[in-house]
């Protein structure tokens, strides 16, 4: 029985509730070894209240025999805008304990991916990140939480507000609260982009940034 998928169902529902005129395309995965269902890829496109067209990419993997239970839920703002993308994932892991045993943990990430160079546009920092600072701090204050060793290349492409936490499955309420805070603020920023930018230049930057982010060298 999955412990990740129900939590991520609620995350996906939170994002879908922001949209109207949705179009949904779903592809189911099947294990080549067993022939059993192994997950799915669901792409949902729709419009926010401001008329911005966005895309939610929801990837699920669940193979009980292998102990694989994971989800990635990303919400992409218009490519030509400066509104951040929401990136999140949740997966179970079997981590070693001090007594030589293993325990089931959750590896949790959430971030609002910056859409400009934060060094040259600190006003983007001021416009985007203060409202999620409390959620960031709360995530790292979860009892017995351990920080994930995020690869340096990946961290450099993310924001300083990237949450990477190892928690227990019983911390599902706390992780969902962090996700919801980031998701609601993402929706606000899609409706009101933080900065004005040339749409052609912005789209080219976004393509390059996403190409670097979703790359095996960045996150092997």
Q: What are the language-model segments listed below?
A:
Residues 1-85:
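Short Lys/Arg-enriched alpha/beta "domain-start" segment
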Residues 3-6, 96-100, 201-202:
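Short, flexible coil/linker segments at or flanking structured domains
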């Amino acid at each position: 029985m999955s412990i990740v998928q129900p939590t991520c169902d609620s995350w996906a529902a939170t994002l879908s509730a922001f949209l109207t005129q949705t179009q949904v395309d779903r592809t189911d995965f099947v294990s080549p070894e067993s022939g059993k269902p192994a997950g799915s890829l669901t792409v949902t496109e729709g419009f926010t209240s401001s008329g911005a067209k966005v895309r939610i990419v929801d990837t699920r993997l669940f193979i009980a025999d292998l102990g694989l239970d994971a989800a990635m839920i990303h919400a992409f703002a218009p490519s030509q805008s400066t509104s951040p993308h929401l990136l999140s994932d949740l997966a179970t892991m079997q981590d070693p304990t001090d007594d030589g045993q293993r325990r089931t943990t959750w590896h949790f990430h959430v971030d609002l991916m910056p859409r400009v160079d934060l060094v040259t546009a600190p006003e983007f920092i001021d416009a985007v990140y203060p409202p999620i600072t409390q959620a960031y701090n709360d995530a790292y204050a979860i009892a017995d939480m351990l920080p994930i060793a995020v690869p340096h290349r990946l961290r450099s492409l993310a924001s300083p507000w990237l949450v990477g936490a190892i928690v227990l499955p019983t911390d599902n309420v706390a992780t969902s609260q962090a996700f919801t805070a980031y998701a609601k603020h993402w929706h606000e920023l899609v409706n009101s982009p933080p900065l004005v930018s040339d749409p052609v230049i912005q789209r080219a930057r976004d393509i390059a940034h996403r190409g670097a982010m979703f790359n095996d060298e960045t996150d092997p």
